[in-house]
A protein has these predicted regions:
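N-terminal cap/lid segment of alpha/beta-hydrolase-fold proteins
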Residues: 1-16
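C-terminal catalytic histidine-bearing segment of alpha/beta-hydrolase fold enzymes
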Residues: 177-236, 258, 346, 355
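Short beta-strand element of the alpha/beta-hydrolase
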Residues: 20-28
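Conserved alpha/beta-hydrolase
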Residues: 43-66
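The serine-hydrolase catalytic nucleophile loop
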Residues: 29-41, 55
Length: 363
């Protein structure tokens, strides 16, 4: 296939040799399209037209190898992936026998977000299946605005925070059929197929119910479930001046529903810096304080809070949390070493500058 900018993409098409719905399978970033091969063959045998593309920079598609690029350049390449996915989608729906009104998208790891964004661009995508990956804000907003879209998510407890991320992502969707499949030690993304033999037939059964047999008419919004605590929290937080009210919701949830994760660390951190970018350091401080409370073992949360205090001109607090960052780094076992080095450099730089200029001792 050719992407819009002329890059040649490689994909595998699995035909059921009869009319049927279509599926787009999107691989994770430490694999290529072949990771979906067994599932694709099984789905084709059940009557589905399936396409599994390689993103540019992976497998047999053209483009610089993503793992050989600096992070900034890799991000530029990844921004082209939606166009690559659209090329695969367009090729699939052009095939004879494909039911263009019944399409599913499935993604693993970094393919998760691409699957949701494909559904956002093409309402013919009637369900998404997500394995062990995050969804960016545009995708989450689409899930919130599309209670008619059923979501199947799966992740394993041994895969870092993937399970909690999947649980949190489902909190943005109000479809009553949503399902989260939890495994104990199945690995990451499509690796789960080899460890949990029931996952593949479970996903195909999901397609039978939510794609092949489901009515084409979208369910009315009145059939949606009530907003989840996740949706209520983020709706509140992102309103102008909403951080203080969101903190009350967070504190109440901590008291009454300790198993509910209202925010992953990275998402709260990103939103806090978004507030700093707008010049709203007071709101950012509240967000970073919640993040410290929720993830006290992470050195990065303290470093971010230090940044917010510094932006607010509160130099004593900025110094205190920069020093706390270095203390927590010693016992932080979850942050990758490369990132820990960046956090250490950030904290040490602030400490040097703050001590050199003297802290603000005003009451």
């Amino acid at each position: 296939m050719k992407a819009a900018d002329g890059v040649t993409l490689k994909a595998t098409y699995y035909s059921p040799r009869k009319p049927g719905p279509g599926i787009v399978l999107l691989h994770q970033c430490n694999r290529d399209r072949k990771a979906w091969a067994a599932f694709a063959e099984a789905a084709a045998a059940r009557g589905y037209h399936v396409i599994a593309p390689d993103f540019r920079g992976f497998g047999e598609s053209q483009g610089e190898r993503l793992d050989a690029l600096p992070q900034q350049q890799a991000s530029v390449v990844a921004e082209k992936w939606p166009g690559d996915v659209d090329a695969a989608y367009a090729w699939l729906v052009a095939q004879e026998g494909v039911d263009n009104e019944r399409i599913a998208a499935a993604g693993a790891s970094c393919g998760v977000n691409q699957a949701v964004l494909l559904a956002r661009r093409h309402p013919q995508v009637r369900t998404v299946m997500l394995l062990s990956g995050p969804v960016t804000q545009p995708g989450r907003e689409y899930l919130r605005e599309s209670p008619w879209l059923p979501v199947l998510a799966a992740a394993s407890r041994d895969d870092g925070n993937a399970l909690e991320t999947m649980r949190w992502t489902l909190g943005w969707s109000r479809n009553p059929s949503n399902r989260l499949v939890e495994y104990k030690a199945a690995g990451h993304g499509t690796e789960m197929f080899s460890e949990e033999k029931g996952l593949q037939p479970l996903m195909i059964d999901w397609l039978e119910a939510q794609l092949k047999r489901a009515p084409l008419e979208r369910a009315p919004a009145t059939t949606a479930t009530p907003p989840s605590p996740v949706e209520v929290f983020w709706t509140t937080l992102t309103q102008p001046g909403g951080a203080a009210k969101a903190r009350l919701l967070y504190e109440e949830t901590r008291r009454t529903s300790r198993g509910v994760m209202l925010f992953p660390e990275a998402e709260a951190n990103a939103y806090g810096y978004e507030l700093l970018g707008r010049g709203d350091s007071a709101e950012a401080i509240i967000v970073f304080e919640m993040n410290v409370d929720a993830y006290p073992q992470s050195a990065n949360t303290y470093d971010s809070l230090s940044d917010a205090y510094l932006a607010a001109g509160k130099r004593d607090e900025a110094l205190r949390f920069a020093e706390k960052t270095l203390q927590v780094l010693v016992t932080d076992t979850t942050t990758p070493e490369v990132f820990k080095a960046m956090i250490r450099e950030s904290a040490e730089k602030k400490i040097r500058e703050l001590k050199k200029k003297g802290t603000d001792r005003r009451p």
